Amino acid sequence: MLKAALVFLVALVCTVAASQEIKTDVGYGSDAAQRLDLRIPAAKNFATLIFAHGGSLTSGDKADSDYTHVCDSFPQVEIACANLNYRLGPQHPWPAQAEDLASAVAWVHTNIASYGGDPKKLFLLGHSSGATLVALAGSDDTYLAKHRLKLSDLRGVMPMGSIMWDDDLEQAIAQHGREAIAQNFLRDPDNRMYGSLEKYEDHWPIHHVHAGLPPFLFLIAESEQEQPSVLKTNVKFVQDARKFGNEADYKVFAGRKHYTMVRQLHLPRDPVFAIIVEFMRKHDL
């Protein structure tokens, strides 16, 4: 199936004109960080992919070399793509990052029809910590609810290269006790943006699996099967989601590493690109 998808995409990219409209630094909020770049295909009623970059929620930018080309090829297969920035910690404490993703989704939902898109065909893709954000937005309905949106307004969610819970933390709690870990949690500067151990734990998507989730497809590099434990936590999310009757699956890409998963998305022969498009085509009806 993947080979057929690749052949189709290469043929389409080679025959469809690369005509597209590009909007840069579009504001979806009042903060300077709340900006997105939007690539729009020369088509009508198209689906839109919303991408969130990685960087541990404290760094990263849509213009970084790892992320600047993520959206390039999607308009050539009649998919719009929004590459967004969001407020970063520790200057902006959690949950500013998740709130910004939800705000970006709301902006696209409200405005994409004016560009020819279908607001009912929205998909999320995130890399690394951005994958945590999209998985959370696709499972914890409180973020979208602030914009009068529901999880059913998302056609699909694709987390790429992120754990779904902190396994090291869970092991530490089991070994040393919750009280001891909680007392030391905020002494780590990286943890202070969360405000408490409870808020940190709650930001992991595994704690929000329930019935009524949009379809999930986890995209995993071969090197991520053990360290970090991306495969382990993604499989557990898939299993839990299926128990509630949701559609969820994962795909491991041979020969890929954490960053090569995202750096080659703009190449029409890229198998990760092909799987993303295939998933979107399946669910954009």
Roles of regions detected by a PLM:
Residues 31, 168-208:
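Mobile cap/lid helix-loop segments that gate and shape the active-site cleft of serine hydrolases
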Residues 39, 217-219, 223, 235-238, ...:
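C-terminal catalytic histidine-bearing segment of alpha/beta-hydrolase fold enzymes
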Residues 63-82:
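Short amphipathic alpha-helix adjacent to the substrate-entry channel of hydrolases
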Residues 19-44:
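N-terminal cap/lid segment of alpha/beta-hydrolase-fold proteins
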Residues 46-55:
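Short beta-strand element of the alpha/beta-hydrolase
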Residues 92-112:
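Alpha/beta-hydrolase active-site loop
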